[in-house]
Regions:
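Electrostatic interaction modules used in gene-expression and signaling proteins
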Residues: 122-124
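Beta-rich carbohydrate-recognition and catalytic domains
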Residues: 1-50, 59-113, 126-176
Length: 176
């Protein structure tokens, strides 16, 4: 789980992968009982077709909550992308990067776990986002992104077809 840095609508919110497969937003009044998690409705791109997850707490921007994500694609390649969630209703995805922001470069592909770049968070520095990241579970790197360029690389998400949606209530998965 990754907590949002402030309450929204009087409630605490957190990013989760409660079902082990889907990025979702859960909320609670007391930080102890997280009953409902709402899956984030976005289609899956090729670079994240095997697995998706979040990469640390959201960053609050005037435009929305910026969420770094990781995706696993062909050859178990881990890449980093981003979502933009509505400020007042963080279960609504208002933007996403179609292409990853960061992928393993040729000189970063060998290591304990090959083909992996992964982060557990980021830091906003004015108009930039500093992203520390692990490389192949063997090295560490830092990337700096212009927030404006991340937002410009986003487009509105397309919802997944209804047959692929799943809703989880109190730990039970219910398919449409």
């Amino acid at each position: 789980m990754a907590l949002f840095p402030r309450r929204i609508g009087g409630r605490y919110h957190a990013l989760s992968r409660h079902d082990g497969a889907t990025n979702a937003v859960a909320s609670t009044d007391d930080l102890t009982i997280w009953r409902d998690a709402t899956p984030l409705e976005v289609d899956v791109a090729g670079w994240e077709v095997i697995h998706v997850g979040n990469c640390g707490p959201p960053v609050e921007l005037a435009e929305g909550w910026l969420v770094l994500t990781h995706g696993v694609g062909p050859f178990r390649t881990y890449s980093i992308g981003a979502l933009l969630l509505d400020l007042d209703e963080p279960t609504i995805v208002i933007g996403r990067t179609r292409q990853p922001l960061l992928t393993p470069q040729p000189d970063e592909q060998d290591g304990y776990v090959p083909n992996v770049v992964y982060t557990c968070g980021s830091l906003r520095l004015g108009d930039a986002l500093l992203v520390p990241f692990g490389i192949a579970d063997a090295n560490i790197g830092f990337a700096t992104f212009s927030i404006a360029e991340i937002l410009a690389a986003m487009d509105a998400p397309r919802a997944r077809p209804a047959r692929e949606r799943a809703v989880t209530r109190a730990g039970a998965r219910i398919d449409d």
